[in-house]
Structures are given as C-alpha cells and as structure tokens.
Amino acid sequence: MTSPFTTTRRELIARTGMAAAAIGLAGHPALSVLAQHGIPQRPIPSSGEMLPVIGLGASKVVAQIADNGTEPVANVLRALVAHGGKLIDTWPRNAANDAGFGRVLSLPELEGKLFVTTKIDQVGKDAGLQQFRDTQRHYGRDVLDLVQIFSLTDLDTHWPSLQSFKAEGAARYIGVTVAQDSQHDDLEQFLRREQPDFVQMNYSITERAVEERLLPFAADRGVAVVINRPFMNGAYFDRLEGKELPAWAGDFGCETWAQFSLKYILANPHFTCVLTETSNPAHMEENLLTAAGPLPNEAQRRRMREFIATV
C-alpha cells in the first residue's frame, strides 16, 4: 500500500528553490505560497485521504519507455514528488513498457511517495482480470491505489471485478473514466446506480460540457473527480498559436496559455485532481507552481470564457 507523502517542509522549500532556479522561476510569487503551504490538496470523499490538485497523466511518457528508457519518466516523477505532487495516472501498454515503469516506481526517491492509478480496457471478464494481474506484476505492487474502467469499456462485466479487487484489498479505490462529451450521459447513468470512489472526465476552458451539471453532480454524489484533457491533448495550444495572452490574465498571476486553462480548472470547487501530461520536468514544475498561485474569481472566469469564444 502506498505510504503517505513524507517530504518535510524544509525539504520541499529546498527542492522548490533549486527547481525554480533551474527553470527561471526563482523569485516567483507562487514560490512563497508553495514553501509555506505546499501544493493545495483536496479530499477523496469516500475516505478523507488528501490528494494534491495537480497530477501527471503518464500514458505517453510510459509508452515511450521501451524506446527511450526509464530516465525521462523518472525525471518527471522526481519533479512531481519534489513539489508535493503524488498522483500518476497510467494505462497498461505492453510488458516492456510496464515492467520498465515498475522499475521506476521502485526507485528509492519515489518508492512509497506516489498514488498510482491504472485502467482496464479489455473486453471480457477473464481478459480484464488478466490485465489487472499483469499490471500488479509489472508494477511490483500487490495493492494498486486506483483501478479504473477505461472509457466505460465492457462496464457491466468489469465493475463487479473492480468491486472484488477492492473487497480483497488489491485496490484501494475503484472508478471509471471518460474522455469524450459523447460519453457523459452514460457516465451520469452509471453514477445514478453505482457508487465509485473516482470518476475521470474531460474538462477545460475549451471543453466545458461537464461544468454545469455532471461535475457538480459527481461531487454531490461523494465521488472524487479527476480531470483529463486540460489542454485537449495539445489541440488547445494549436488553437491559440500566435495569439497573445490578454494583459488582464496577469491579475490572477497567469503568464502562459497553459496556466490560463489550468487556472480556470483549478478555480472550480468540484474536482479533486487535474492531470497534466508532459515528458518535460520543467513543465511539470510549472504546472505544480500554477496551483500554488492566485486563481481567477467567478467574474474573471466569465471573462476567460468570453475571450476563448473569440479565438
């Protein structure tokens, strides 16, 4: 079972300062907030366990282990942990990549400091069970923090299996994921009849379909919400290429387009953790520091929505 995050405040301050200097953020106002309070955290409703509000969506960087080795993902995870982050969201790929990721999880500086999630994406009960057991073996973990059904795949078959994993102590939490607006109705129906610990859904400044109903509904049901696609898998940056960040974004400490979307999400009270996918430790650090800085109020969020509608 994953241990609680144990970095001391003194260690956090020291690591934050070194990392910030490396990426040109020394003296940034968010650093003082981070040093005093750490990354903001929110509770998992079913247990009260706290999670930092920024996590790593690691499907791409883990999928590159067989070609690029383990050091790229290890470096991103070191940056995550150094700033108080802990959630890493994964998706089984193949034996070579997953076994390599297991070696990363066993590194002394990372062992016991990560909240590791995985997914089942197979059709059929036996295939799902085998995928879960393979993940346990490759990751070197008898207990996985969170097991999710990817995109509601074969939901009625796999959900009883996940409930068994949790009852047996092989999974601490269980849930489901979606990443497309077309799946939101099915997710809502699932939430009306079942009580997962977690759901994962797409949400950003440019994908706001869940904002008015599904996101607050999940929170009202006592379900932790993990946000994916904060940058629309890169399409967000393509849309804004060549556009200047409005000067008024500086009123809430926003300096980049990445921060523009992240700060919009972070100001929403109904989510638990937002996944940022990167293979660059400096970008991981910037994302974590964004969470420690000022956030837009509702009037500013409305202005953000109006601006995005024009580009």
Regions found by a protein language model. Give the residues of each.
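C-terminal segment of N-terminal export signals and the immediately downstream linker at the start
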Residues: 27-58, 66
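N-terminal secretory signal peptides and thylakoid transit peptides that target proteins
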Residues: 1-23
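Conserved, mostly hydrophobic/aromatic
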Residues: 44, 56, 88, 116, ...
